[in-house]
């Protein structure tokens, strides 16, 4: 397994190449259609999540600028959640050029090339839903169970990482209020994502299958200041 992962990482590590590109080249609008692909083996949601986390955690260590990687990650999440307008705004705001209208090949304003693997843009067609197993054994825990709190890792689209006191029974709506109180970010400007999925206010953490070491992404959508 390690050999396969190592080979895949090597194949996708042209990501922040020094390949230079002349400015003023072709720049296509971001396409709305999501890439369709099939994994070599049926992949669970957890495996896909781990694969994506590995890429995003290591990509900035290679060529390219961290702020561009952060923008590409936010754009990829928005695009997978069918928020094409937000994804395009993120790309435009970071001055990212798309020669083919896809995040699989991008350039920053300095001409550095960035390549995103397809698994960061869409789940495979043979993805195994972990939710189905839970539905078969749907035994709600009694409300009398002791509430166990932990430090939830949250990463803002601004690049800031922070922690919130949370329990698995907390709803996203409740956590949004906590983030608002802690960081002064209006609830209406918060969009919470996990494993490429938009989390609604009524969603509970236990429904997301999140574990303590995982990170929830929060896109902060605030109006740009007038110049």
Curated annotation (Swiss-Prot):
PROSITE patterns: UBIQUITIN_2. It holds the Pfam family ubiquitin. Residues 15-24 have a biased composition (Basic residues). Gene3D superfamilies: Phosphatidylinositol 3-kinase Catalytic Subunit, Chain A, domain 1 (3.10.20.90), Ub domain-containing protein, DC-UbP/UBTD2, N-terminal domain (1.20.225.20). Residues 150-225 form the Ubiquitin-like domain. InterPro entries: DC-UbP/UBTD2_N, DC-UbP/UBTD2_N_sf, Ubiquitin-like_dom, Ubiquitin-like_domsf, UBTD1/2. Residues 1-45 are annotated as: Disordered. Residues 1-14, 25-39 have a biased composition (Basic and acidic residues). May be involved in the regulation of cellular senescence through a positive feedback loop with TP53. This is Ubiquitin domain-containing protein 1. It comes from Danio rerio (Zebrafish). The gene is ubtd1.
């Amino acid at each position: 397994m390690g050999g396969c992962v190592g080979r895949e990482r090597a194949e996708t590590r042209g990501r922040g190449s020094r390949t230079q590109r002349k400015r003023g080249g072709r720049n296509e609008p971001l396409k709305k259609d999501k890439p369709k692909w099939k994994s070599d083996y049926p992949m669970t949601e957890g495996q896909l999540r781990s694969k994506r986390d590995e890429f995003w955690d290591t990509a900035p260590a290679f060529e390219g600028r961290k702020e561009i990687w952060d923008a590409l990650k936010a754009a990829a999440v928005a695009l997978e959640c069918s928020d094409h307008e937000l994804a395009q705004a993120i790309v435009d705001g970071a001055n990212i050029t798309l020669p083919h209208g896809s995040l699989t090949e991008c350039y920053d304003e300095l001409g550095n090339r960035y390549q995103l693997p397809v698994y960061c843009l869409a789940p495979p067609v043979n993805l195994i839903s972990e939710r189905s197993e839970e539905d078969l054994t749907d035994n709600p825990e009694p409300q009398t169970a002791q509430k166990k709190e932990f430090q939830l890792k949250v990463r803002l689209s601004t690049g800031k990482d922070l922690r919130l006191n949370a329990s698995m029974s907390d709803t996203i709506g409740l956590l949004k209020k906590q983030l608002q109180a802690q960081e002064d970010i209006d609830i209406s400007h918060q969009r919470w994502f996990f494993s490429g999925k938009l989390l609604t206010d009524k969603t509970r953490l236990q429904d997301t299958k999140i574990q303590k070491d995982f990170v929830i992404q929060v896109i902060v959508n605030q109006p740009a200041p007038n110049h």
